Amino acid sequence: MVIKKVHSRQIFDSRGNPTVEVDLWTDKGMFRAAVPSGASTGIYEALEMRDKDAKNYHGKTLFNAVGNVNKIIAPALVDKKMDEKDQTAVDNFLLALDGTENKNKLGANAILGVSLAVCKAGAAAKGVPLYRHIADLAGNKEVILPVPAFNVINGGSHAGNKLAMQEFMILPTGAKNFTEAMKMGTEVYHHLKSVIKKKYGQDACNVGDEGGFAPNILDNKEGLELLKTAIANAGYTAEIEIGMDVAASEFCKEKKYDLDFKNPDSNPNDWLTSDQLADVYKDFVKNYPVVSIEDPFDQDDWEAYTKMTKDMDIQIVGDDLLVTNPKRVQKGIDLKAANALLLKVNQIGSVTESIQACKMSQDAGWGVMVSHRSGETEDTFIADLVVGLCTGQIKTGAPCRSERLAKYNQILRIEEELGDKAVFAGKKFRNPLK
């Protein structure tokens, strides 16, 4: 089997911004992939190529990236007669075609669109589901269904409220299977809506980019209190734990942390040191069932990460810190600067490098959480990815907004297809392969 034709176009993501879509043809038919886009992006991410033409879509058009697929990548791939089943060979060819460290010649969004489409075509060529093909690529004999981490309260760069910390998540680790985890998550979500409406009014039930509620609160502890109440009201206090994505790089100023960063007149005397912020997290963990904190410090504050990972017995997830980049993941492992990787395919820009970063993390005993981006599409690739890579945890928003539910619904279908062979990560979500 060989790749016969590749075509790219500009479509729109869930925030109404242009993004890249790629169609790829083989003898088995046409395979389509769409590329997501982030809001709180780490400075070390691979280059998302935008045209920066201020007169068009606020500078966010992608005609150069699309052109790179159609004029450079497509003819090269077709001419090479590459086998879509050999993901590593195709991705290495794409990386060589670009030839830069952070994919700034062709664009990570151009390369990733092709890489994702190739992966889907490879599964079809083998006659297996996508998650099985991904498991094969990763060398996994098993597949595991993940615990969903529902982002039900949005703050930070994902919402127009005063909340500094970006995501407050619920993890139904006590569920028996993925279907039950969805039941718990959706029921708590609706209870949370009632709690927020009663306390803050109907306006507070507006949702952020990822489907979570965005009440106009300033105190991060209040966000945790709302979750605790909603979980109790749903009757799942024993089954549901809490995760957070702080996205601290977004409010780091002069090596301090401003929890009132959305206020242009915030008081510098109130800004916190790394140690003071770590004490805030310790208080959260002491008073709430918080089991996972992502990006607790700035993406260059390695020392603070190492200290917190040593001091606290919870999952410390590196997102902006590691940007799914195998080199930065290795640095994180060497410095013991985290104990989990947030895996975002568009941060690094190819399926092969994503698998490499995942395997490195798992081999070091780390957890891995597969993640969407705030600017998403209806593409469900990451649902199959999380099952095939056996990471045991996925965050892809609240159980609200179709671009989020598309992923959760795909995992439900996979669970149904696996039948009595389905294994759910549950309480072992941090290291499900052990």
Swiss-Prot record:
Mg(2+) is required for catalysis and for stabilizing the dimer. Its cofactor is Mg(2+). Its EC number is 4.2.1.11. SMART domains: Enolase_C (SM01192), Enolase_N (SM01193). Substrate binds at residues 158, 167, 294, 319, 371-374, 395. The keyword Cytoplasm applies. The active site is at residues 210, 344. CDD domains: enolase (cd03313). It comes from the Eukaryota. GO terms for cellular component: phosphopyruvate hydratase complex. This is Enolase. It comes from Doryteuthis pealeii (Longfin inshore squid).
